[in-house]
């Protein structure tokens, strides 16, 4: 099993996918400098109650607070999730599209081993890259704002970043499952992007009155990554974090179902 993980990391290290992903992440960071102060998907009556994308929206440029620095550090998370979807779908389907996976199966490697080693490699690399992504923004915000965080504040930000990272793993589990079922990178990416951005639109309309909405809409909102990002990015966790384990377990279950489908699926 360890050799299979080594093989996956070797393929990733010697492919253009990782370089491309890192390049796109760097481009997003550069775009953040160009855009400056921004608030997307905002709603509410003032900065404290706004949900969603908030970049450099300081209540006071002279006396920045930890929450405003943390918001800016997490602001571009949704953009990274799209990058993560592209990475997961392209890297997972590459060997299927080229047909090279047949060689591994012909040499007696079990399909489930190939499936799970590739899936776990995607999830681990994505999580590490995302944490570096957030840390980079955090350092930039500290330098630009002059705010010096305490150790407990850094731990708080790490907790929010890990929560968003957990959502990323769940989202990529969905995309990997769809890759097994649909086997088309473009369609899978389109479905996942529609799933993400439709969640933002629906939640914006409902977020201030979630207690009265219908159960199907609640399932859609609580099962959408934008629900978590738009709250975590605004430092809102009360009543939000409780839904995350169910979302994560549900998506990981799809990943397991994908492995079962993989056993019976014909490799073309």
Spans of model-derived segments:
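Secretory targeting signals
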Residues: 25-91, 115-183, 197-201, 208, ...
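Central hydrophobic cores of alpha-helical transmembrane segments
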Residues: 21-28, 187-199, 217-220
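Aromatic- and glycine-rich beta-strand/loop motifs that create alpha-glucan
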Residues: 1-25
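Residue-level recognition of membrane-helix boundary sites in multi-pass small-molecule transporters
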Residues: 16-20, 113, 187
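Transmembrane helix boundary and interhelical loop/hinge segments in multi-pass membrane proteins
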Residues: 87-107, 111-112, 119
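Junction motif at the cytosolic side of a transmembrane helix
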Residues: 11, 248-268
